[in-house]
Amino acid sequence: MALLSVLALASFCMGAAPLAVPRDSVATKLDAHLRTYVEKEGFRGAVLVAKDGKVIHRAAYGLADEKGKRPNQVDSQFLIGSLTKSFTAVTVMQLVEAGTLDLQAPLSRYLPKLRADLGNSLTLHLLLKQRSGLPMHLDSLVERESETDVSSAEILRLINTARLSFKPGAKYEYSNLNYHLAALVIEAVTGKSYAQVLQAKTFGPLAMSDSGIERATNVPPKRSFGYAKGLLGVSRDENNVSYALGSGDIYATVDDLYTWAQALFGMKWLSAESRTRLFTGGTRAQGYYGYGFRIQPYQRGPGVQERGVLVRHGGSMDGFLSNLHHYTEDRLTVIVLGNVRPFPIRALTFELKELALGVEPGSRSRAEVDE
């Protein structure tokens, strides 16, 4: 498949226009579909669907706190897991625009304490494209049993024990360590914590007041609790996420994520070069990966033969799931945040897209889930 480019993001009117669907009818169908998932799959979380710059459905479902019977609200805060990687990639590009970072420079320039073979062979480009050869996870004991915050120095120490599984640049292989390292670089060149940089460059300027970086000493007041399904019902399933620096430690609301999406896809926040880097993906074998986003084709609404460009990322971690999908040509954004696992979040997200475009979910959406 040819590379999908950011140039498509400016092409909102390609091909025949899809048939219009009344907004109130769409909202009713979206809500009914979500309630079916609540009943049959135990979905709990918050959802926002926006079309042509207007929110057409925004609602919360299920419980945020099983013990206290506190319901999820539209302003509930959820851990977003690997959707954090998209924020890290954007922050790197902001620093590139400022002349602070060079995507092709060896990491040793920024992290002199990184093991020599890693520092000399890895670049930010390879990290963001998931082509470093680093393993998927940091350390199972750290990820599952840490009761106190893991420091950046400790994360770097653990990365220095990692072995490469292939020559850097040889192929695509998804790894959380890539984005741990990118966050460490951000901290090194700014002299500030990852949380402080995100606040200064994204959360503050975009007025994302319900978003931030979670730590043991910073658990947000409106956060939903994460749960795992079991034979006897659901049970709390959470962990200290400080180990997930730059790859899974952000919490947010659906409203804040929509604000962020509007800035990203509105063509005004980042330079054209940055958008090209972020939103140019590869082949399916390369994970459709750009910089912190997956870019792949999608099927549009009735009467439109051309396939559109989907920009997406999701997350899955203890008790939480997330998806942010932006269907470029249809100017459609679907955001799903959940606080129970396992749950078929990708299927639900694609089905919500179908309904918003006036298509009944079925074989088309199932095929896109598998793509």
Segment roles from a protein language model:
Residues 17-59, 146, 187-192, 196-200, ...:
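Catalytic loop of the DD-peptidase/beta-lactamase superfamily, centered on the K-T-G motif
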Residues 60, 75, 138-220, 242-258:
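Catalytic-site signature segments of enzymes, centered on catalytic residues
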Residues 79-83, 95-139, 161-163, 184, ...:
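Active-site helix/loop module of the DD-peptidase/beta-lactamase fold
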Residues 25, 29-33, 82, 87, ...:
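Extracytoplasmic/secreted proteins, especially bacterial periplasmic and envelope-associated proteins
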Residues 19, 63-65, 106-113, 140-145, ...:
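Short linear capping/connector segments at secondary-structure termini
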Residues 2-12:
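Bacterial N-terminal signal peptides
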Residues 36-46, 67-129, 164-177, 245-248, ...:
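Short active-site loop at a secondary-structure junction
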Residues 60-68, 153-157, 226-233:
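Acidic-glycine-rich active-site phosphate/pyrophosphate-binding loop
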